[in-house]
Amino acid sequence: MPPKLLVSTRNPHKLREITAIMAPFEVELISLDAFPDAPDVDEDRHTLEGNAIKKACELHILTGLPTLADDTGLEVMALDGAPGVRSARFAGEEADDAANRTLLLERLQGADDRRARFRTVIALCTATGTHTFEGICTGTIIREERGGHGFGYDPLFQPEGHDLTFAEMAEQVKNAISHRGRALQTLARTFDLAMLDSAPSESAP
């Protein structure tokens, strides 16, 4: 049987993206839905790296499974890197994606410099240690939303060298160039997934 890998998310969009990218590897991905009593990890660190490591390690300790966790931030040059680590909570702790996008457009109203980048840090916590992998995708924030795919800031982000926003792209096209895709590709190139077999089997759901 393939080794199990817990993905620290209940977000179906994110899980689908990670599953598609990890499809070539002999790994059984398990979402947090398999652990309904697992508490949400408080993302209270000041960096993407800190949040990713905290989530991966806390859930690895809780479940005994190797755990993959990530944190992603949209860094806008004209806003001095904001929303950054607070991207998911840009418009408030209870804000949804639409509210975050609306606030971003308001903050950029009249701005000529609309350069931005998505940055993802993935942390993989196993019985033998913790490793981090980074992926970056540069682009611009357009002036109005386009596209119905994706999630988060995807309808506003047009990656460099492309005429479409992330939300207008087919899933496989986005996965090939996205920040999360690049971070996962770095993981795949530099990490031996066979070590996931070291996870204690009795912890599997």
Regions found by a protein language model. Name each.
Residues 2-6, 10-205:
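Anionic-ligand binding patches
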